[in-house]
């Protein structure tokens, strides 16, 4: 297989948040409704919360997506992710929404630990690399069954990562050596329909093409799902029709273990 862009761990010092990150209040399981990691979904004065979990094979670029989206930077060194959480406040129709991004490990050795991060997930970003046919194959063979086992109703957005490598000559040569080709966009769209994903989006963490669209779609789908969970017998709340820029007030990172 060709060399893959990876999921480097979020650097502790090199990528400083705009404002020093706040400490999470409370111990494990002690966060209240609306707090990242909290069990409640309701908002309150600080705004509502959306929990977004990124899953997919190792080295498909999950962490790169998060780092690029949250810092406008791109990590160059590949360090396999264990479990990391990132939290931010974003503005949706003028109202604050606390977005929790849970970056999970795709390696098989974490299969038993990974589902611990799935509790109260509002939206899954199921990632595969468009230049890794094996990671695409695992979408339906491994990841969808795992998600549906633990979160039968949570929405999924299928994300094709590393789209900037589709035309990369070195990558194409390496794929050809294995008698493989990049995953056709049409095949990915068909897969999204088959797994009943909310949508399919191709993006690049390096160039940031369609990167914001991925997380905007995740926030909208997460809010819709959260509303149905809170008010199953009432009509759905109005879907935000305009996604506003990410609030630059503060970012924070904390451990995902529960």
From Swiss-Prot:
It comes from the Eukaryota. Residues 1-45 are annotated as: Disordered. Residues 10-27 have a biased composition (Basic and acidic residues). The keyword Zinc-finger does not apply. One of its GO terms (molecular function) is guanyl-nucleotide exchange factor activity. GTP binds at residues 56-63, 103-107, 161-164. Keywords: Cell junction, Cell membrane, Cell projection, Golgi apparatus, GTP-binding, Isopeptide bond, Lipoprotein, Magnesium, Membrane, Metal-binding, Nucleotide-binding, Palmitate, Phosphoprotein, Ubl conjugation. Ubiquitously expressed in all tissues examined. Expressed at high levels in the stomach, small intestine, brain, skeletal muscle and placenta. Changing residue 86 to C: Loss of PAK3-binding. No effect on ARHGAP30-binding. Changing residue 107 to L: Constitutively active. Results in increased rates of stress fiber dissolution and cell migration. No effect on ARHGAP30-binding. There is a cross-link at residues 177, 248 (Glycyl lysine isopeptide (Lys-Gly) (interchain with G-Cter in ubiquitin)). Belongs to the small GTPase superfamily. Rho family. This is Rho-related GTP-binding protein RhoU. It comes from Homo sapiens.
